[in-house]
Amino acid sequence: MYHVVAATTNPAKIKAITLAFTDVFGAENCRIEGVDVDSGVPRQPLGSIETRTGARNRVMMARQVRPEADFWVGVEAGIEESMTFAWMVIENTHLRGESRSASLVLPESILHGIREGRELGDEMERLTGVQNIKHKGGAIGVFTDGKLSRTSVYHQALLLALVPFHNPIYQIPVQAAKP
């Protein structure tokens, strides 16, 4: 059984991680454990590089907390220009898989608050009245009227980040081209 450490305690992220690992390896073969670790980036990462760094840092911290695990998973949401998205980073002892989620253009009413230094989740709570929205459907759930959620969008990106761990083509050694 694979011991998978999710570098988060956010229920929406843990559910996405659970769904992805279950899809790839089977529910009976995975045990998911969430741990609270720091991303090492601001609460609201800005830009792809800062956001991916946050996901990688989460994996690094989770590895320190649970070194005996088989997989470590970091998910970090961020904003780039006018869009929200997230980076997924999955590692085992010898491989790393990464993927970026789909992006959602945010309305100016939200972006204004972010430019003033507030977090997307806080702005969404302020505008919708939904407490702790980032642990639920998130901005994606609100703007798609529930057709998508943080969990569903992250699930898809996590499946892509898992590809190097199960697709045999990724294990084929590189052969030098013959002149």
From Swiss-Prot:
Catalytic function, reaction form: XTP + H2O = XDP + phosphate + H(+); ITP + H2O = IDP + phosphate + H(+)
SUPFAM superfamilies for the chain: ITPase-like (SSF52972)
Domain of life: Bacteria
Keywords: Hydrolase, Magnesium, Manganese, Metal-binding, Nucleotide metabolism, Nucleotide-binding
Keyword Protein biosynthesis appears in the UniProt entry: no
Cofactors that this protein relies on: Mg(2+); Mn(2+)
Binding site for Mg(2+): D38, E68
Residue sites binding substrate per the record: T8, T9, N10, P11, A12, K13, E68, A69
Enzyme Commission no: 3.6.1.73
GO terms classed as biological process: nucleotide metabolic process; thiamine metabolic process
Cofactor note: Binds 1 divalent metal cation per subunit; can use either Mg(2+) or Mn(2+).
Alphabetized GO MF terms: ITPase activity; metal ion binding; nucleotide binding; ribonucleoside triphosphate phosphatase activity
Family according to the record: Belongs to the YjjX NTPase family.
Reported function: Phosphatase that hydrolyzes non-canonical purine nucleotides such as XTP and ITP to their respective diphosphate derivatives. Probably excludes non-canonical purines from DNA/RNA precursor pool, thus preventing their incorporation into DNA/RNA and avoiding chromosomal lesions.
HAMAP family linked: Non_canon_purine_NTPase_YjjX
Subunit structure: Homodimer.
NCBIfam families: inosine/xanthosine triphosphatase (TIGR00258), PRK05074.1 (NF003459)
Name of this protein: Inosine/xanthosine triphosphatase
Organism: Pectobacterium carotovorum subsp. carotovorum (strain PC1)
